[in-house]
Each structure stands twice: as structure tokens, then as C-alpha cells.
Curated annotation (Swiss-Prot):
The gene is PPX1. Belongs to the PPP phosphatase family. PP-4 (PP-X) subfamily. It holds the Pfam family Metallophos. This is Serine/threonine-protein phosphatase PP-X isozyme 1. Mn(2+) 2 binds at D79, N111, H161, H236. It comes from Arabidopsis thaliana.
Length: 305
């Protein structure tokens, strides 16, 4: 059994790797990711997944429902880390699968794959707690800079974490972005990771998130038409039912973190596409283990007995 297969087995038991193993894994991943396009081409059949947010046991549930990688070809649309209790194990497992089966799993960047955001929403603190230094956080956030910004399935389905940008009319314009950097505060790259579709907006609107834009149905129609795509698949927004179509099925939100933050009570979904791009949503609930909330603390030693 190779080192990598052993590490994958270990991560599937939610046991983190050593710091030196993380460093080596990230270096291997970098070599693979640097070759990918800003608009990564993906073949069907493929299963599309939305936000995971460090909910490791729920991701294990996702693999139970959707099948193991590499048997199933997966596309994860970002936000692997933050908010959940197991961002380290979640991200490292996905990264190890990417290194082991590069053609069977595609990882695109979400707005939480950023140094600034992870210092606020949990991943940085988790790395510090589990490793005693920020080195692992640094190795992982360096990898974030290499991740693709979007993907296109069979030239027909455009997949992105957040949404569209007023600076982007065509997929070719996305291809020209220099992605190997921290997510900027504004501009095309920021918008792709931060924007949201909104019913009550026609055209473009200001986003309450403070980054990206709100965009309406007419924007989606013209983007899809210009790029000859059938619809957009994206994540980024909690959907209580696990998925949600908008604008006459021109865009779909897929959300893959059930009982988000261990308290929202939502279901999650993944979108399975067969070789002819026929769609099947698989809806699933939180894993039993994870519905209990935070990981059990090891009992404190009984010094006083």
C-alpha cells in the first residue's frame, strides 16, 4: 500500500496527518493544480457538490450517498473549510483524493479558500489547535491560490462557487485572470467567488455580503446564451431543501452541508449528471455522529483523585 493510500485511509477515519505529511501532500497537489485551467474542463458523468464547511462526517455521508471516489467522478464547488469542526481533515482528504485520482475529482475555489476569511471563521484556529503552529494553515492556504476558479461540464454546464461578474461576459475572459493570488476584495475573481443570484434584482445590485454582486435573471440569460451553456451550477448559499432552481432553470444552487453549523436543520444535496447530462438530485441528512455537535473532548486527567 502506498503512503498516499495509507494517508487516505487515515483521513477517512478523521485522523489528521503529521505536519511533514501535510507539507509533502500540498507540494504534490500544487504540481497538479498549477496545470489546471481557470475554467477546468470536466467530462460527464460527474457528481456536483456544494459547500462542505468542515463537516467531515456529513461529507462521509455524501460519499455514502454518491459513491466513493474514484468510482464516482466528483466536482466540489468550493468552501471546504471554516465553521465546521473538522476543516483540517475535510480539506486534507479532498486534497489527498485529488493527488491520488487527479482525473476523478475536481476542486474549485470558494470564497472561504482565502487567508483572510479563514482567520475569522475557524480554519486558522483549528490548525493552531491541532498542530500547535500556523504552518499547516500556511501550506493549505498556499494551495488555495492554485485552485481553479470554475469548471465547465461537457461545454454545457458552467460551475462556479458564487456567481457572475459585471466584468465577465465570456468564459474566455475568466481564462485570462491571474488566479494565483489571495482572493481580491473586488474585481472579476472576487465576484465569481462571492456573487449571488437574486429574484428581486434585474441586472446588477449591491451585495449585502460586502463583496461580489447580486445578479438577476436577465444577466443569467445573456451569459448562458453568449457562452452556449445550458445552465449555471453554483453553491455559496444555504438552501433548506438542499438545492434550488432559479430563473426558469437557468441556474441552480447546490448545498451539501446538512444541518449547517450543526443547527440550521436543512437537508443537503448533490447533483448527479449522467453521460447525457440527465440530472438527478440526491438529498441527504446529517450523519448521526455529526448531529451531536462538537467533537467529544478527551476527559481531563483526574489530578486530584
Amino acid at each position: 500500500m502506498s503512503d498516499l493510500d495509507r494517508q487516505i485511509g487515515q483521513l477517512k477515519r478523521c485522523e489528521p496527518l503529521s505536519e511533514s505529511e501535510v507539507k509533502a501532500l500540498c507540494l504534490k497537489a500544487m504540481e497538479i493544480l498549477v496545470e489546471e485551467s481557470n475554467v477546468q474542463r470536466v467530462d460527464a458523468p460527474v457528481t456536483l457538490c456544494g459547500d462542505i464547511h468542515g463537516q467531515f462526517y456529513d461529507m462521509m455521508e455524501l460519499f455514502k450517498v454518491g459513491g466513493d471516489c474514484p468510482k464516482t467522478n466528483y466536482l466540489f464547488m468550493g468552501d471546504f473549510v471554516d465553521r465546521g469542526y473538522y476543516s483540517v481533515e475535510t480539506f486534507l482528504l479532498l486534497l489527498a483524493l485529488k493527488v491520488r485520482y487527479p482525473d476523478r475529482i475536481t476542486l474549485i475555489r470558494g470564497n472561504h479558500e482565502s487567508r483572510q476569511i479563514t482567520q475569522v471563521y475557524g480554519f486558522y484556529d483549528e490548525c493552531l489547535r491541532k498542530y500547535g503552529s500556523s504552518n499547516v494553515w500556511r501550506y493549505c492556504t498556499d494551495i488555495f491560490d492554485y485552485m481553479s476558479l470554475s469548471a465547465v461540464v461537457e461545454n454545457k454546464i458552467f460551475c462556479v462557487h458564487g456567481g457572475l461578474s459585471p466584468a465577465i461576459m465570456t468564459l474566455d475572459q475568466i481564462r485570462t485572470i491571474d488566479r494565483k493570488q489571495e482572493v481580491p476584495h473586488d474585481g472579476a475573481m472576487c465576484d465569481l467567488l462571492w456573487s449571488d443570484p437574486e429574484d428581486i434584482v434585474d441586472g446588477w445590485g449591491l451585495s449585502p455580503r460586502g463583496a461580489g454582486f447580486l445578479f438577476g435573471g436577465s444577466v443569467v440569460t445573456s451569459f448562458n446564451h453568449s457562452n452556449n451553456i445550458d445552465y449555471i451550477a453554483r453553491a455559496h448559499q444555504l438552501v433548506m431543501e438542499g438545492y434550488k432552481w432559479m430563473f426558469d432553470s437557468q441556474i441552480v444552487t447546490v448545498w451539501s452541508a446538512p444541518n449547517y453549523c450543526y443547527r440550521c436543520g436543512n437537508v443537503a444535496s448533490i447533483l448527479e449528471l449522467d453521460e447525457n447530462l440527465n440530472k438527478e438530485f440526491r438529498v441527504f441528512d446529517a450523519a448521526q455522529q455529526d448531529s451531536r455537535g462538537p467533537p467529544a473532548k478527551k476527559p481531563a486527567p483526574d489530578y486530584f483523585l
